[in-house]
Regions:
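Compositionally biased amphipathic helical and low-complexity segments enriched in hydrophobic
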Residues: 7, 51, 106, 129-132
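Generic hydrophobic, helix-prone segments enriched in Leu/Val/Ile
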Residues: 1, 9, 65, 121-124, ...
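Amphipathic alpha-helical segments enriched in hydrophobic/aromatic residues interleaved with Lys/Arg
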Residues: 114-156
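Intrinsically disordered, low-complexity sequence elements enriched in Ser/Thr/Gly/Pro
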Residues: 17, 29, 54, 94, ...
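N-terminal low-complexity or simple alpha-helical regulatory segments
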Residues: 1-22, 26-28
């Protein structure tokens, strides 16, 4: 089943990269730092969010957490979440890469590799993780974009 992805673009949004195929979507975007999501939302996709520049206030299940550049954010399928600007953030914009993976793909992976328990991992370990500067090097993610393009192009 193919998911329809809806995005409300705001003035100042600059999409650096966008690719969607067969239940996997990669989005690299630069947005004004003062961008605030208006509503809590949820979706059936699992979300892996890397904040490359700037700061964000992330809300999971009505609890607020601060995320800064280099943080990896995991969002469970169906989890209520939202992102807001941080008051006093001197950065004019923030930059992030998000990988969305359809729930059906994770369920299929869990059947093929039951020892990994990917869905259960997201359910138990959602939240914000600090990575080292080496782990967040942009070049690694740009290389990953190329790898994902290759995988997406050769899935079928």
């Amino acid at each position: 089943m193919e998911t329809t992805w809806l995005h409300s673009m705001v003035q100042g949004d600059e999409t650096q990269y966008y690719r969607k195929r067969d239940g996997i979507m990669v989005e690299h975007m630069v947005r004004p730092a003062n961008f605030d999501m208006r509503y809590n939302h949820f979706h059936q996709e699992y979300e892996i969010y890397l904040l490359l520049r700037g700061k964000r206030q992330m809300f999971f299940e009505n609890r607020a957490y601060e995320a800064c550049a280099g943080n990896l954010i995991l969002v469970d399928s169906g989890q209520i979440h939202m992102s807001h600007s941080l008051p006093g953030d001197p950065e004019p914009e923030y930059e992030r890469i998000i990988l969305y993976v359809d729930k059906a793909i994770v369920e299929q992976a869990d059947k093929i590799f039951p020892e990994l328990k990917i869905g259960a991992f997201f359910h138990k370990h959602y939240g914000i993780y600090e990575l080292t500067p080496e782990e967040t090097e942009q070049t690694r993610f740009y290389a990953m974009q190329e790898d994902l393009n290759y995988l997406i192009d050769n899935l079928k």
